[in-house]
């Protein structure tokens, strides 16, 4: 049997996931993180993107995170997300529209602040579309 640890994914609105997992993949402030059983303790910021959860027996779940904090302790991992949305709950049409608007905003930006904000919005829209795509593949 594969080694596991307990994972909690919590947003301000609700507890999104709680259970045993084999591993997770998430984007931290320093880059991509793969958290396996026995990982060293860690506290890091999470960038907007997805968390890939590999549950017991290899079943996968994808959740969009708008950012937050990841805490790794012996035997347990906690994700405190600003916003968390399951892949099947994301609206593909709205994500595509947000991507289009962000791309337009980038083209028409007139300063570093405008460009940075538009780039962040584009990254969020692309992350949502990636979560939707991976969720469809996993079904």
From Swiss-Prot:
GO molecular function: ATP binding; proton-transporting ATP synthase activity, rotational mechanism
Compartments it resides in: Cell inner membrane
Key words, A-Z: ATP synthesis, Cell inner membrane, Cell membrane, CF(1), Hydrogen ion transport, Ion transport, Membrane, Transport
Family affiliation: Belongs to the ATPase epsilon chain family.
Name of this protein: ATP synthase epsilon chain
Lineage: Bacteria, Pseudomonadati, Pseudomonadota, Gammaproteobacteria, Enterobacterales
Gene Ontology annotations for the cellular component aspect, listed alphabetically: plasma membrane; proton-transporting ATP synthase complex
Membrane topology: Peripheral membrane protein
Organism of derivation: Klebsiella pneumoniae (strain 342)
Matching Gene3D superfamilies: ATP synthase delta/epsilon subunit, C-terminal domain, F0F1 ATP synthase delta/epsilon subunit, N-terminal
CDD domains: F1-ATPase_delta
Highest taxon in the source lineage: Bacteria
Subunit structure: F-type ATPases have 2 components, CF(1) - the catalytic core - and CF(0) - the membrane proton channel. CF(1) has five subunits: alpha(3), beta(3), gamma(1), delta(1), epsilon(1). CF(0) has three main subunits: a, b and c.
Entry annotated with the keyword Transport: yes
SUPFAM superfamilies noted in UniProt: Epsilon subunit of F1F0-ATP synthase C-terminal domain, Epsilon subunit of F1F0-ATP synthase N-terminal domain
Record's function text: Produces ATP from ADP in the presence of a proton gradient across the membrane.
């Amino acid at each position: 049997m594969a080694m596991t640890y307990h994972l909690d994914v919590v947003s301000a609105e609700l507890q999104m996931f709680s259970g045993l997992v084999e591993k997770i993949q998430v984007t931290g402030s320093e880059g991509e993180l793969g958290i396996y059983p026995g990982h060293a303790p860690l506290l890091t910021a999470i960038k907007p993107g997805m968390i890939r959860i590999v549950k017991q027996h290899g079943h996968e779940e994808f959740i969009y995170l708008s950012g937050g904090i990841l805490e790794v302790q012996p035997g347990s991992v906690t994700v405190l997300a600003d916003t968390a949305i399951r892949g099947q709950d994301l609206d593909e049409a709205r994500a595509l529209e947000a991507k289009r608007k962000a791309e337009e905003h980038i083209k028409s930006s007139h300063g570093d602040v405008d460009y940075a904000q538009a780039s962040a919005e584009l990254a969020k829209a692309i992350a949502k579309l990636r979560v939707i795509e991976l969720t469809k593949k996993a079904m």
